[in-house]
Amino acid sequence: MPFDTDTDIEFTKGTLRHSEYHKILSKHFKVIVSHIFTGQDIFQYEPKEEYDCIVSNPPFRGKSKIVSRVLEFNKPFMLLQPFAIFNDRNPIGLISDQGKQVQILKFNQRAKFIKPSGLIEQKVTFQSGYISTGILENDFIVENLVMPTPKDIREYNKKIERE
């Protein structure tokens, strides 16, 4: 799994937080981690170790460049993206132009994100999910998210602010 770290680097407070990708996937798979902040930029880096697929939360900007680069690896992939990606023919077109089937993992509600400050974003104004090739059992899946309550988010954010 290139393009993630085993710890998320949180710069504003200088703390390290464990990556959710790494924590979950490493329970079942050997995970290769990489990240731009550790000198492994997706546009110049490919792991030397053998790997089977790419699971990543890439930047939401430069979607076409990211999809194009991931396609160069010729591996199944799963990328977290805002669904505004479907407003632009290019990123999705790049996948279908290579004869690959676009797969979608959508959530029943908007996901919450942790901001660089470590706080949970309370109001997310866009829908996001995963675009994928060759990973999902079905081409379109809707997954139910279990979300923290507003009270849980407030308590978590207060705890982070005190740290």
Where does each model-flagged region fall?
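Class I S-adenosyl-L-methionine-dependent methyltransferase catalytic core
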Residues: 1-163
